[in-house]
């Protein structure tokens, strides 16, 4: 069964315009992400789905493959779906059951072990989306709206994702930072088969998705399950120019 990775990368980020092309340790961010995806032996091919010719040309300049997509997509998953449609139109060998890995274009610290873990998880999830999470250990991370939190049921299926601190341990937070075992950070990587991907993008943007600016809430609001795999590894999404300095310090640690 074919497994591909598609990296959505748009130029016009509100907080960091041109982010995929910003340099991190002598390489554009998008090249770091692409190389991380290529390091997984479980992925057959990697593509960047972009809305900007500058990103496309940059990807091609380092030997990568890029697909031009519309600038009007409300989420990265919608952009990926257009890229997959184009691949299908060109006769690429994708089936309804083929796995598509969505690796966010601003996650240059993702490890191949995380990608491989998600692919393994997806082999048993024909009707669900897959993703990863890691336990939160720092109070600042729990209250940081740029770090998405997730809570899940006893079977590992997501109940909710939020930029707010969830679950909020009322009694313990009155006295100080709670050290409970239910605080998890969402890692910016998804997996789905082609059928679920098509189903997802056929749904209208949901109210919770708009409020939280989290595309995965569209799935939950429409009854699509999201299986959460727990990882011991961390990652770091770049949201602002200031994050580049932090990422540079972390890069050697996470390599």
Curated annotation (Swiss-Prot):
Spell out the reaction equation it catalyses. Answer: 3-deoxy-alpha-D-manno-oct-2-ulosonate + CTP = CMP-3-deoxy-beta-D-manno-octulosonate + diphosphate
Its chief place of residence is: cytoplasm
Instruction: Kindly state one GO CC term assigned in the UniProt record.
Output: cytosol
Query: What EC designation does it have?
Result: 2.7.7.38
Q: What does this protein do?
A: Activates KDO (a required 8-carbon sugar) for incorporation into bacterial lipopolysaccharide in Gram-negative bacteria.
| Organism whose genome encodes this protein | Thermodesulfovibrio yellowstonii (strain ATCC 51303 / DSM 11347 / YP87)
**Lineage per the UniProt record:** Bacteria, Pseudomonadati, Nitrospirota, Thermodesulfovibrionia, Thermodesulfovibrionales
Cellular localisation? Cytoplasm
Q: Does the keyword Nucleotidyltransferase apply?
A: yes
Please identify the protein, giving its name as recorded: 3-deoxy-manno-octulosonate cytidylyltransferase
Q: Cite the annotated pathway.
A: Nucleotide-sugar biosynthesis; CMP-3-deoxy-D-manno-octulosonate biosynthesis; CMP-3-deoxy-D-manno-octulosonate from 3-deoxy-D-manno-octulosonate and CTP: step 1/1; Bacterial outer membrane biogenesis; lipopolysaccharide biosynthesis
Q: What keyword terms does UniProt attach to this protein?
A: Cytoplasm, Lipopolysaccharide biosynthesis, Nucleotidyltransferase, Transferase
Q: Read off the InterPro entries from this record.
A: Cytidylyl_trans, KdsB, Nucleotide-diphossugar_trans
């Amino acid at each position: 069964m074919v497994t591909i990775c598609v990296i959505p990368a748009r130029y016009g980020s509100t907080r960091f315009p041109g982010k995929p092309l910003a340099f991190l340790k002598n390489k554009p961010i998008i090249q770091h992400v692409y190389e991380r995806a290529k390091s997984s032996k479980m992925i057959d091919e990697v593509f960047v789905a972009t809305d900007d010719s500058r990103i496309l040309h940059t990807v091609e300049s380092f030997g990568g493959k890029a697909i031009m997509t519309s600038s009007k997509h409300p989420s990265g998953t919608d952009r990926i779906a257009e890229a997959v449609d184009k691949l299908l139109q060109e006769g690429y060998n994708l089936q309804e059951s083929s796995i598509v890995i969505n690796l966010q274009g601003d996650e240059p610290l993702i490890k191949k072990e995380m990608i491989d873990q998600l692919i393994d998880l997806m082999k048993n999830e024909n009707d669900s989306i897959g993703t990863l999470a890691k336990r939160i250990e720092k109070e600042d991370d729990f209250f940081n709206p740029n770090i998405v939190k997730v809570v899940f049921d006893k079977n590992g299926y997501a109940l909710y994702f939020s930029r707010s601190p969830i679950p909020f341990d009322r009694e313990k937070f009155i006295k100080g930072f709670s050290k409970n075992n239910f605080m998890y950070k969402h890692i910016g990587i998804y997996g789905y088969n082609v059928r679920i991907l098509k189903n997802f993008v056929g749904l209208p943007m949901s109210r919770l998705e708009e409020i939280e600016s989290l595309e995965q809430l569209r799935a939950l609001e429409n009854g699509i399950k999201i299986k959460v795999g727990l990882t011991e590894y961390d990652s770091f999404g770049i949201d602002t120019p200031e994050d580049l300095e932090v990422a540079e310090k972390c890069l050697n640690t996470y390599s």
